[in-house]
Regions:
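Nucleotide-activated chemistry modules centered on ATP-dependent adenylation/adenylyltransferase
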Residues: 1-255
């Protein structure tokens, strides 16, 4: 773990939250960091309201993975469409011309993050419930700068990054000690970077995979190969996403 002058250590943050004796909302992405947060919350016997946000609703490999975590933690996970889902629809991402007028007439909501937080609290918790995430300062230079500038506790928005000082080794150790297996994402995603084969890809907990995070070749190609029904589900919402595969295959000389 790291230390930054003047910033509250994550262990103290977690202990303070536990002392409040109130439920907390966990932004649960199924990624390593959010799993590590849940482990720490459970260790302190805290009541967790886990909320997952699906970039594309109804993907079976994600639903199956959420069920696995529900069984492990013995807690229901709320699964909502992500704000990115509505944003992509409103921006007509991968939409054929005949759908554009229909989508524009539907006027789907495009809530900001703070509005989304308010909706989560209104429906599943109290107005002042803390929302927790697994943002870590060592994950990237940008995140380290954000932690140094704004701190891991945002009182105005009632958000906390409660493992901000953990390194990736700390995350892996926490998950390994509990015997938790990561979802298929960590085997599938990371094989491609910017449409090219990533020869340094390594799956599993000790690898460099990642959870599903967008509709682009790096994610679409593995879903196409490993979960064809889910790939068709993506095309149901974003029909022209298939052009992403065609485009990169042409660039890479596969067709």
């Amino acid at each position: 773990m790291i230390e930054l002058d003047g910033i509250t250590p994550s262990a103290q943050m977690l202990d303070d939250l536990a002392a409040e004796g109130r439920p907390v909302i966990l932004n649960f992405s199924r990624g390593k960091d959010s799993i590590a947060v849940w482990i720490e919350l459970e260790r302190r016997n805290m009541q967790v309201i886990p909320i997952h946000k699906s970039i594309v609703p109804g993907l079976k490999f994600i639903e199956d993975d959420l069920k696995r975590y529900e069984d492990y933690f013995q807690t229901h996970i709320v699964d909502l469409p992500a704000d990115a889902f509505y944003r992509m629809l409103n921006n007509l991402t991968f939409q054929p011309p005949e759908r554009c007028a229909i989508i524009e007439a539907a006027a789907f909501p495009s809530p900001t993050r703070e509005e989304w937080d308010m909706l989560m609290r209104d429906n599943f918790a109290e107005d002042d419930t803390w929302i927790l995430d697994g943002v870590r300062a060592t994950d990237s230079a940008q995140r380290r700068m954000a932690i140094m500038r704004h701190g891991p506790i945002k009182h105005r928005t009632r958000r906390q990054s409660v493992i901000w000082d953990w390194g990736i080794a700390d995350v892996r150790r926490a998950i390994k000690d509990r015997g938790i297996t990561l979802g298929p994402d960590y085997e599938w995603f990371g094989k491609y970077l910017a449409g090219k084969v990533n020869r340094r890809h390594k799956g599993g907990l000790d690898g460099n995979g990642r959870s599903f995070d967008g509709i682009r070749y790096d994610f679409l190609k593995p879903i196409h190969d490993h979960a064809p029904d889910d790939y068709q589900r993506i095309l149901h919402w974003f029909p022209l996403a298939e052009l992403e595969l065609m485009r990169m295959d042409m660039i890479n000389g596969s067709v």
